Amino acid sequence: LDYYHFVSARWLIKPEITLETFKEKMKQVLQNPFLGQAGADASERSAPQRFLIVGLGESGYAMAKWCLVQGAFVRLADTRAHVELLTRQIDWLDDLQKLGLVDTCFESSDWSTLLDGIDVVGISPGLSPIQEPTFTLLSECQKRNIAVWSEIEFFARGLYALEALAMAAEERYKPSILAVTGTNGKTTTCALTAQICERAGKHVALAGNISPAALEKLLSVITKANNFIELPEIWVLELSSFQLQFTYTLDPTAATVLNLSQDHLDWHGDMQAYAAAKARILGKNSVLVLNRDDEVVTALFADEKESRKVIQFGSDSPVDIDSFGIERDPRAGGIDWLVWAEPDEATLASELEEAQEGFIKHKRRKKLDAYEKSDELRIKRLIPADALRIRGRHNALNALAALALARAAGLGISPLLHGLREYQGEAHRVQTV
């Protein structure tokens, strides 16, 4: 499966490049959208072609559809009987069959047979790795050296393939990926991040646990776009611990674990495993957006703060350059302000120039130390917490996290504040009735 079979790939070909030339170019760049990052020599690797998708939920449907569109072989399995499927799931199954799905198995239990001839298992996030029948499935995969991917792993590889395809066509597509997880506040923070980035003039795609599935959204934007310019500039992803468990190559521009408390222990087994799954959100090159109020989160990333760019937020005054916090003005009965430790003008001008070129160079901690220690922090008041339409101190922290994520994508503060004021919140979350 060569990557030129990618859905709607023909619009990605420059007019002066013939299809034959483009095919030859693509063979030198990567084999197909399942190889992952294009940094390694794709010609030396064998891309997976045969997939077992386990679970007909939203993610399972998205994975199966993505693979079928790419021309890969798909086997779909679900532990439920066909008669137990909901109307929506029956519609999904009909859609997949129209795309060429013929190999299905319901009330699945014989994994040894289902895994025959399979290169990769795509697993739905609702299936716990420590519970049967998933535990037996994973054990069998390990014995056979069969990879297990989440839907987000498929998404990451598809996005990297799209970036490589742009490069082959002498174009540039390098979107920012802003990834959010945590026990609480994920949906609000993601929706708010997407809105303020859009308010700053960016084309934003919001997907993941918040719905739609990331792969479904990726397929949709590719199908609708006529050129690279029409693709999202920023992807905002809400990711659960379930989705992160089998994700390996996602490397977000910035990532945050908003907070951590005991949750989903029946799925993970214990708090340590739960926290470890959450920590997978941080990629090799990601800016860490860190909640300094949460002791569990700060301990989880204690070893990361010296090796990468960190933007902190919390309910007290900022402690580092470019970090965020809350300060109280004792006048007028006490007003809480969202505040920012503003970088110097030279730094801001440099970031603006880099952002206009389509990328941000995140300085390592060693390069920041001299500046941080040489001057007092310049604390800038942004907006009163009461100016937010979403209420509660927890939502003020969600707003700070959104600002930090947008800053990591190279966006200036001023247009983001308009988006903060306008955000009305999500349904059934601290609503006035």
Regions found by a protein language model. Give the residues of each.
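Flexible loop/N-cap segments at domain edges
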Residues: A402
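N-terminal leader/targeting and accessory segments in enzymes
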Residues: Y3-F154, A161, R391, L411-S414, ...
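Extended acidic/charged loop-beta regions that coordinate divalent cations
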Residues: W111-S112, E171, A225-D266, F301-A385, ...
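Phosphate-binding loop of NTP-binding sites
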Residues: Y4, L35, E44-R45, L68-V69, ...
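Gly/charged, well-structured mid-domain segments that form the phosphate/adenylate-handling core
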Residues: R389-R391, L405-V433
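Cofactor-binding loop segments of dinucleotide-utilizing enzymes, especially the Rossmann-like FAD-
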Residues: L56, T79, G182-T183, N209, ...
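Short beta-strand "acidic-cap" motif of Rossmann-like dinucleotide-binding folds
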Residues: V74-D78, A205-L206, Q312
